[in-house]
Swiss-Prot record:
GO molecular function, one term: methylthioribulose 1-phosphate dehydratase activity
Designated name of the protein: Methylthioribulose-1-phosphate dehydratase
Keyword Zinc applies: yes
Alphabetized Gene3D superfamilies for the sequence: Class II aldolase/adducin N-terminal domain (3.40.225.10)
One Pfam assignment: Aldolase_II
Protein role: Catalyzes the dehydration of methylthioribulose-1-phosphate (MTRu-1-P) into 2,3-diketo-5-methylthiopentyl-1-phosphate (DK-MTP-1-P).
InterPro entries: Aldolase_class_II_sugar_metab (IPR050197), Aldolase_II/adducin_N (IPR001303), Aldolase_II/adducin_N_sf (IPR036409), MethylthioRu-1-P_deHdtase_MtnB (IPR017714)
Biological source species: Methylococcus capsulatus (strain ATCC 33009 / NCIMB 11132 / Bath)
Recorded family membership: Belongs to the aldolase class II family. MtnB subfamily.
GO process terms (BP): L-methionine salvage from methylthioadenosine; pentose catabolic process
Length: 204
């Protein structure tokens, strides 16, 4: 019996991977992607796969707690995905690139990146004017993923209007109501992060 919704979401994640890799935002086997299905299961990339060369067998299923449903090993950062889905019931996709601008910017600032008065902010869900200000928190990297996931989830619970967060020296996470929405956020945010690095005098 075919799991049609899973197959559809897997195809969308594969396409997103090709797009993101084509821009150099997931080098080597970095990054991880997921999509939440209607029944609460989560389609997520298998650990260690190159995101620009994903195949259907490179997408697996986990439950809402991040436990494998097919015996394979999910992304090392699965708990960061499940935390986002708990905090945002409307979210049905999470994308995590290791993009150059977000990684570099996290070396230039501490605590948070402030994005303000950019027209492209309107690419983010719920924003309809450039005259706005969003805070993108920057968290120190941590190889203890459960500890990092708890710290991030606690922040997200306390703060409204968060569209993304950066892990220092690592990359960023963003989410949306669909894979297409999350991908739009990735593209817009990486552009804005690049502009912010230039404002710090860094030429790319």
């Amino acid at each position: 019996m075919h799991d049609t919704e899973f197959e559809t979401r897997a195809a969308e994640l594969i396409e997103a991977g090709r797009f993101i890799d084509g821009r150099g935002w997931v080098p080597a086997t970095s990054g991880n992607f997921s999509a939440r299905l209607g029944d609460g299961r989560i389609a997520i990339t298998v650990s260690g796969r190159h995101k620009g060369r994903l195949r259907p067998e490179d997408i697996m299923l986990v439950d809402a707690a991040g436990r494998s449903l097919d015996g394979r090993k999910p992304s090392a950062e699965t708990l960061l995905h499940t935390g986002i889905y708990r905090r945002y019931p409307e979210a049905h996709a999470v994308l995590h690139p290791h993009s150059p601008a977000s990684t570099l910017l996290s070396r230039l600032v501490s605590g948070a990146v402030i994005l303000e008065d950019y027209e492209l902010l309107k690419a983010l869900a719920g924003i309809d004017t450039h005259a706005t200000r969003i805070v993108v928190p920057v968290f120190p990297n941590d190889q203890d993923i459960p500890r990092l996931a708890l710290k991030i989830e606690e922040y997200l619970v306390r703060h409204d209007g968060v569209h993304a967060y950066i892990i220092a020296g690592h990359g960023f996470y963003t989410w949306g109501k669909s894979v297409a929405d999350a991908l739009r956020h990735v593209e817009a945010l990486e552009y804005l992060f690049d502009l912010e690095t230039r404002m710090h005098g860094v030429k790319r």
